[in-house]
Amino acid sequence: MADYLISGGTGYIPDDGLSAQQLFAVGDGLTYNDFLILPGFIDFTSDEVDLTSALTKKITLKTPLISSPMDTVTESSMAIAMALMGGIGIIHHNCTPEFQANEVRKVKRFEQGFITDPVVLSPHHTVGDVLEAKVRHGFSGIPITETGKMGSKLVGIVTSRDIDFLSEKDNNKYLEEAMTKREDLVVAPAGVTLKEANDILQRSKKGKLPIVNDKDELVAIIARTDLKKNRDYPLASKDSRKQLLCGAAIGTREDDKYRLDLLTQSGVDMVVLDSSQGNSVYQINMIHYIKQKYPELQVVGGNVVTAAQAKNLIDAGVDALRVGMGCGSICITQEVMACGRPQGTSVYKVAEYARRFGVPVIADGGIQTVGHVVKALSLGASTVMMGSLLAATTEAPGEYFFSDGVRLKKYRGMGSLDAMEKNTSSQKRYFSEGDKVKVAQGVSGSVQDKGSIHKFVPYLIAGIQHGCQDIGAKSLSVLRSMMYSGELKFEKRTMSAQVEGGVHGLHSFEKRLY
């Protein structure tokens, strides 16, 4: 045996790594890439890991993921998909109060399998309009009503079978000539269950099943393609009435009180006070107002990055805190305003303080990979809010476009001039609605197509579970208790360590995540 090797028992284990307290004791601001978590002992499978976590004082999610209130990330389609997967979506407020309230209403009224806001045309639209809708939305089975709107009398339907063999000169042909007429349609009455509707659709061998009320007005539609996708969502985030959970963002100005009233009438479960710097008299006054008028409504305050900021909002009565300033991929606040904080340090410092008062923390921004999600949760965050990671999914607002053969969707910061020019709500978020000269705190860009949330979020969930398994934490509550007890160990990474931890030494490679 080599002379440097010692023969003996294994009772001795050297101290290794740093506790979170030691890691953040130094004054350096740390991002998620600046450290790693040391592995622990595995005695369970990854699918046993429980990801249940508190969103607010009274709302718990089975998946700790939230979609950000940005106008290129979250409207009703995203919020529905996130809630079905066990997370929640926060509807943006860079729009009219009426539009936002209607988006919330769509989420709360959602029934799995029933499409309540399909593309609808009138008999006076043309075949060209159908072809255009097919390019934009990817399907051509479109119900035809008298006015071209939902709630109007059903007069027919146009499917690919009706138009596939028409020539280009027929593009101006009216749909009343091309459509399948009402008398030839199979329909189901309003109030039918999803199972009954599915049975009718299967027996009829049709592609679409319109749902009509007793006046023969269109109220919903079921698609055969959705039948294949229809499955149980055991993790779905629901309220006591079995409706999907939905949040919405509002500002802190006087006119936001009207927006708040409309949102509560729509059944919103929580409001997020959307401000780049939450420690303000405006936000504190708004928290007091909401808690007085709607005491049961959950209120998320922020954004904050220090315990001192958090204290004022906790004292005002918030039910959760949103943490992050200048760390988003499209955010230039730190560059322009010289204000902010690296996100790793922000999450740890605020979460460590807020937990003493039972206030959960949402890590908002800077999430580029599933590993970053695990790191945020290991630093004390209860949930993680994502923007760019969910942008360019099928459910995100906006239309796809191609650039150099790559399928993209637009993504922009709410502090970008683009967003500010669209609506004053974005200006209020950055306290600049009265400024003659607008100072941008965000940029506009594009993100590559990621496919559907229904495929992407399961990848994130599996990644978080595997991360917790490697750490040796069977649940997120165990993960946080390990961190606060000092059992969870971290290690700083040098720049060369970060290079080593990524793909390196290859001539070329393809990175497929799922």
Swiss-Prot record:
Keyword Oxidoreductase: yes
Keywords per UniProt: CBS domain, Cytoplasm, GMP biosynthesis, Metal-binding, NAD, Nucleus, Oxidoreductase, Potassium, Purine biosynthesis, Repeat
Subcellular location: Cytoplasm; Nucleus
Superkingdom as given in the UniProt entry: Eukaryota
CBS domain mapped to chain residues: 114-174, 179-237
Catalytic function, reaction form: IMP + NAD(+) + H2O = XMP + NADH + H(+)
EC number: 1.1.1.205
Activity regulation, per record: Mycophenolic acid (MPA) is a non-competitive inhibitor that prevents formation of the closed enzyme conformation by binding to the same site as the amobile flap. In contrast, mizoribine monophosphate (MZP) is a competitive inhibitor that induces the closed conformation. MPA is a potent inhibitor of mammalian IMPDHs but a poor inhibitor of the bacterial enzymes. MZP is a more potent inhibitor of bacterial IMPDH.
Protein role: Catalyzes the conversion of inosine 5'-phosphate (IMP) to xanthosine 5'-phosphate (XMP), the first committed and rate-limiting step in the de novo synthesis of guanine nucleotides, and therefore plays an important role in the regulation of cell growth.
Name of the molecule in the record: Inosine-5'-monophosphate dehydrogenase 1b
Native source species: Danio rerio (Zebrafish)
